[in-house]
């Protein structure tokens, strides 16, 4: 498994190019310490202090435990490095202004549960954690508003495929 990136994610905002997140210290994230990795995962902040675009699903990862983030960091450090340098994102104006992501975060970034479940036992709570956090299921299976925020009142109810081909299915218990 080499996490060299390069995949292009088409959206209404333009095209995001998946970065190299291999252990290469120059082209990848190999020079990041655990604090930098955690800050990216949980707050969407790069080591240089700039906002990461929410095409990286930190809006879900913010729900991950510190231990799970540390374990993921340790695992990724064991994977092969790649010196592949990827193209920059190709975003439409004004989405190309990275500073505006701070406003998006103000509106949409929080670690509240997406669904309130009364009297959930440990198994249900763990499943909710996996779906809402590391699994980041809602990032594709939930429709978005005009600013790219998740329509949480339609949580996991299916969404248009951002690449324009078909739909991402409804995965709610009452779905088709």
Question: What are the residue ranges of the model-derived segments?
Answer:
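The canonical Cys-X-X-Cys-His
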Residues: 1, 37, 72, 127-130, ...
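Detector for the c-type heme attachment site
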Residues: 1, 42-43, 57, 77-78, ...
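Extended, well-folded interaction surfaces typified by the phenylalanyl-tRNA synthetase beta subunit core
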Residues: 84-99
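Electrostatic cytochrome c docking/interface patches
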Residues: 103-132
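Electron-transfer interface patches adjacent to heme c in soluble/periplasmic c-type cytochromes
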Residues: 8-39, 59-69, 154-176
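Ligand-binding pocket scaffold of soluble enzyme catalytic domains
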Residues: 51, 76-79, 83-84
């Amino acid at each position: 498994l080499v996490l060299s990136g390069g995949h292009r994610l088409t959206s209404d905002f333009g095209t995001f190019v998946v970065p190299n997140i291999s252990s290469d210290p120059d082209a990848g994230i190999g020079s990041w310490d655990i604090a930098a990795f955690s800050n990216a995962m949980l707050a969407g902040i790069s080591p240089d202090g700039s906002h990461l675009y929410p095409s990286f699903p930190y809006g879900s990862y913010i729900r991950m435990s510190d231990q799970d983030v540390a374990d993921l960091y340790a695992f990724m450090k064991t994977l092969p490095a790649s010196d592949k340098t990827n193209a920059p994102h190709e975003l439409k104006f004004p989405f190309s202004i990275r500073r505006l992501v701070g406003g998006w975060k103000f509106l949409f970034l929080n670690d509240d549960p997406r669904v309130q479940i009364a009297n959930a036992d440990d198994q249900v709570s763990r499943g909710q954690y996996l779906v809402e956090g590391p699994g980041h299921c809602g990032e594709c299976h939930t429709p978005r508003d005009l600013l790219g925020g998740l329509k949480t009142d339609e949580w996991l109810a299916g969404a248009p495929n951002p690449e324009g081909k078909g739909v991402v299915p409804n995965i709610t218990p009452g779905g088709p």
